């Protein structure tokens, strides 16, 4: 078996076809893989997707051309959830504003809010949403999770939306 290693992103369909030509297995990150690519790569049987989003992969075309998918869904859920919690706390406490004022040599009593006083709305409850719920529970905030249809109602009910 021949192993080829490429460490650069290719974005055009012709560059993708050229790079994956005669390969049975390939790992993609941001490359768009659709039917126009797959029909010209008959040797390709497995695509490993680096990262979590599948929006760049045409799953119907993969099935049509009998190409298998290797995917690590949820692999980054903790880092994304932690970023959401830390960003919410920083925004509620107005930390960025306070930091800027201190750097200018000024100090104001910044009145922020505590996460425990808020209602946090989570749009979708996939890998990240479920992990975010786990991280928010110790803050004793009200948590609403919903795969929503009516954004207006959802916006009205929440202080923090993730």
Region spans (language model):
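Short, polar loop motifs at secondary-structure junctions
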Residues: 1, 31-32, 147-152
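N-terminal glycine-/charge-rich "phosphate-binding" loop or analogous flexible N-terminal tail
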Residues: 1-25
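Short, hydrophobic beta-strand segments that form beta-sheet elements in well-ordered domains
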Residues: 5-8, 25-28, 47, 142-147
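Acidic, amphipathic alpha-helical patches
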Residues: 13-16, 34-37, 111, 159-160
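Glycine-centered tight turns that cap/initiate beta-strands
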Residues: 22, 43, 159-162
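Phosphate/diphosphate ligand-binding glycine-rich loop within oxidoreductases
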Residues: 25-99, 113
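A short, charged, Gly/Pro-tolerant segment at domain boundaries
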Residues: 101-108
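Rossmann-like dinucleotide/phosphate-binding beta-alpha-beta segment
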Residues: 110-162
